[in-house]
Regions:
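Pocket-lining segment of extracytoplasmic ligand-binding domains
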Residues: 95-97, 105-107, 114, 135, ...
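An extracytoplasmic/periplasmic, membrane-proximal ligand-sensing/linker region
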Residues: 180, 184, 190-191, 201-203, ...
């Protein structure tokens, strides 16, 4: 009988311990009171999101209770869809694509994503229409009839390509479009399989840098009147300049840019998002990527339009005296 009571007591202790542990784990997942494993969606390895995401993820992991795992992805549009279904918590995106997601426009037509908020904007993402000297292409209009990579279907680069072609009186029907990643685009130009590529990313972009090793790179300029028309119709764009020396180009190139940003699921714990935001912006000196110089608290809420900022991030920026 005593043996039975001892066994019963042991079973009860183990059962209660299991329940307490399960409750603790569950509470940590909601409240942010313990370490949390979070996924940070970036982009392809040849872009800017992936290497920069690695550095930002490390800072957050080192300074907070969040363990960040950066993941490669198809970038902005795919990232928004992944946040929609709850398979990740944080993501890089272009500001225009995040806005389209919230509004249910463009590639999200009629299917808005309402479970996301902004942490901050980060740096300019330059629209680069890349070709080489040997292609003979010197303007956007020259792309007519050419084999051109326009990015993955529904990607940020794809939307930018369609809008820029439109402003120049062209459409996808006027080119031989191919849906390639940044790396694939660079490889395609190198191999002679395509003539040009639309790439929207922070400069210098890894894939284009690799291409410039063996090729004379040309970035096609956008004329001032076309820039103004584009900005008027699509206000998330801003005029941008690629400096001479980038990819060994001899003269600066006028083009346009959107902004990169960090997006988060709106139900992520406020205190945790505050700590993550604080970790990044209090330690920007640890970001060695070329785009790190643009990441400042003072500019973190620029270019977000009507997007809501997560309360945790808003709390940090309010402490810094920064508002939209």
């Amino acid at each position: 009988m005593k043996k039975f009571h001892k066994c019963f007591l042991l079973v009860m202790i183990l059962t209660v311990t299991g329940i307490i542990t399960a409750c603790k784990d569950s509470n940590e997942g909601v409240s942010g009171s313990g370490n949390q494993n979070l996924s940070l969606l970036t982009g392809g390895t040849g872009g800017t999101y992936y290497p920069l995401g690695g550095q930002i993820g490390k800072i957050i992991s080192d300074k907070t209770k969040a363990n960040i795992t950066p993941q490669t992805s198809g970038a902005s549009a795919e990232n928004m869809e992944t946040l929609r279904v709850g398979e990740a918590e944080i993501a890089f995106s272009q500001t225009d694509i995040a806005a389209y997601a919230l509004e249910g426009k463009e590639m999200f037509d009629g299917k808005p994503i309402d479970n996301i908020q902004a942490i901050s904007s980060l740096y300019p993402e330059t629209v680069q229409v890349v070709t080489t000297a040997k292609s003979g292409i010197k303007s956007i209009e020259d792309l007519k009839g050419k084999k051109v990579s326009v990015g993955a279907p529904g990607s940020g680069a794809y939307i930018n390509a369609m809008q820029i072609l439109e402003i120049h009186g062209l459409s996808e029907k006027d080119i031989k479009g191919q849906n390639l990643s940044f790396d694939e685009s660079a490889e395609g130009i190198q191999a002679g399989n395509i003539d040009a590529a639309f790439i929207t990313a922070g400069t210098p972009t890894g894939a284009v840098e690799a291409l410039s090793v063996q090729n004379d790179i040309i970035i096609l300029p956008i004329a001032e009147d076309k820039i103004q028309a584009l900005v008027k119709k699509y206000p998330y764009y801003a005029e941008d300049t690629i400096p001479s020396g980038t990819y060994k180009i001899k003269s600066e190139v006028k083009t346009v840019a959107v902004k990169a940003m960090l997006v988060v699921k709106k139900d992520l714990d406020e205190d945790l998002v505050y700590e993550m935001t604080k970790a990044v912006y209090d330690n920007t000196d640890q970001i060695t990527h070329a785009k790190g110089e643009f990441i400042t608290a003072e500019t973190a809420l620029e270019g977000l339009g009507d997007m809501e900022v997560h309360p945790g991030a808003a709390k940090y920026f309010k402490e810094k005296g920064v508002s939209k």
